């Protein structure tokens, strides 16, 4: 346990005392800490293990160049690129087992950019004054743990010592984990998307895949989830996909918070990864709102509240045609090994018959548009069932298993 190394990222010109304390705490636990300096203007307040000149050189510049015109917008990309290169080289030699960064607004931004470029599974912690708010820009789709600093990270005192010590212990503790992101068998790892309104179906699918000997990674399809799944495809960690929840596309088209960006639904086709698709959750979008307040522009829409602050309007026939158009466009690069299963009795529990968002006209418009627009490389099957029905899920699982066989 004493051979684990934590790289500590900090601006040592302003956070030298705190960085030295963190290094001391990790050493006291039996670990090894390396201080990586991303500070530019002043002299380091403690001796770095990886000095700023080395980081800058690895980022494609020189200390002299940056000091001649010390601008944050010029220095940050260089430090970020240099730190990424250094840490990735260390990872290749099994010389780093966790990364801990800390800072205020700029330090947090730089640490986050570095960690977002590091592989899934490597422990990553940011102790930040920015962690009590919207952290999505810092975490993005990576397994980054953010910890609120409470006070400014400026000097040691009873509070900061305690919190810095906790962060150091957390990083050291994570470094001890024996698990690595790797396949446990020769069989494909299956990626699957899910939403709360089709979870019963997702659980049944997962059970069936496991019984067939496959491991499944399930992603909550609310934006970051779909993007994370596709990044793991690119990195080779996922070899087959049951894309059960395509609601992220609806939010992309109509301005909901679940949008996963323009690349969503293009990756599996380009990589040739076997995929079975279901438009789960496409019939609605998710919008944040004041508690139980219907947004003015959706007064005429059939709707429900998923919870007090998440408003869920039912997309009408024209809205659904637009969603079908985008889904079809994004599957144009698919070269085969892809099937779209259409659940004719409802794309989620919200829109089955007698449910609050049931709209047979909108569903028909959607399904007809998909059948008209989907490329010939995507097989289309109409299933007389709802997306959560066991018969639908079993057909989907069987289809993907047949592709893998």
Predicted regions and their residues:
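Short Gly/Thr/Asp-enriched flexible loops that form oxyanion-binding sites at enzyme active sites
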Residues: 101-120, 202-206, 352-359
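Phosphate/nucleotide-donor binding subsite
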Residues: 47-95
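Cap/lid and interdomain-hinge subdomains that line or gate substrate/regulatory clefts
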Residues: 67-68, 134-197, 322, 382
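Gly/Ser/Thr-rich loops at beta-strand to alpha-helix junctions
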Residues: 11-17, 97-111, 191-202, 222-224, ...
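N-terminal phosphate-binding or glycine-rich loops at protein starts, especially the Walker A/P-loop
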Residues: 1-43, 98, 107-117, 121-126
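C-terminal non-catalytic interaction/assembly regions of soluble proteins
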Residues: 5-7, 14-34, 256-405
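Short, acidic/small-residue loops that bind anionic groups at enzyme active sites
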Residues: 98, 110-139, 148, 217-221, ...
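Glycine-rich phosphate/diphosphate-binding loop of Rossmann-like nucleotide-binding domains
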Residues: 15-27, 34, 40-51, 185-235
């Amino acid at each position: 346990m004493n051979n684990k190394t934590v790289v500590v990222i900090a601006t040592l010109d302003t956070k030298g005392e705190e960085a030295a304390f963190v290094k001391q705490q990790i050493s006291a636990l039996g670990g090894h800490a390396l201080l990586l300096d991303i500070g530019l203007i002043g002299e380091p307040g403690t001796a770095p293990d990886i000095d700023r000149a080395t980081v800058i050189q690895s980022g494609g510049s020189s200390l002299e160049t940056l000091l001649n015109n010390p601008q944050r917008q010029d220095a940050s990309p260089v430090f970020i690129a240099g730190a990424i290169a250094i840490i990735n080289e260390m990872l290749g030699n099994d010389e780093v087992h966790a990364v801990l960064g800390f800072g205020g607004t700029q330090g947090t931004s730089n640490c986050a950019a570095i960690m977002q470029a590091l592989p899934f599974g490597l422990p990553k912690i940011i102790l930040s004054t920015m962690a009590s708010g919207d952290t999505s820009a810092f975490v993005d789709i990576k397994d980054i743990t953010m910890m609120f600093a409470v006070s400014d990270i400026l000097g040691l005192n009873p509070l900061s010592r305690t919190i810095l010590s906790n962060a150091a212990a957390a990083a050291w503790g994570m470094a001890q984990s024996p698990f690595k992101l790797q396949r446990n068998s020769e069989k494909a790892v299956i990626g699957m998307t899910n939403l709360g309104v089709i979870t019963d179906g997702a659980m049944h699918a997962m059970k069936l895949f496991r019984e067939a000997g496959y491991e499944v990674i399930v992603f909550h399809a609310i934006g970051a989830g779909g993007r994370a799944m596709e990044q793991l495809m690119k990195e080779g960690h996922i070899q087959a996909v049951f894309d059960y929840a395509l609601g992220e596309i609806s939010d992309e088209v109509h301005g909901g918070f679940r949008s996963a960006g323009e690349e969503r639904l293009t990756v599996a086709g380009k990589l040739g990864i076997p995929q079975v698709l279901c438009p789960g959750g496409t019939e609605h979008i998710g919008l944040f709102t004041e508690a139980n307040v219907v947004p003015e522009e959706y007064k005429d829409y059939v709707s429900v509240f998923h919870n007090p602050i998440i408003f869920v309007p039912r997309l009408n026939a024209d809205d659904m045609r637009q969603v079908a158009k985008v889904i079809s466009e994004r599957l144009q690069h698919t070269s085969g090994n892809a099937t779209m299963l259409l659940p004719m009795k409802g794309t989620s529990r919200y829109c089955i018959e007698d449910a609050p968002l049931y709209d047979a006209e909108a569903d028909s418009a959607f399904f007809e548009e998909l059948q008209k627009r989907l490329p010939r490389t995507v097989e289309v099957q109409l299933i007389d069932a709802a997306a959560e029905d066991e018969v639908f899920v079993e057909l989907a699982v069987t289809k993907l298993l047949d592709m893998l066989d």
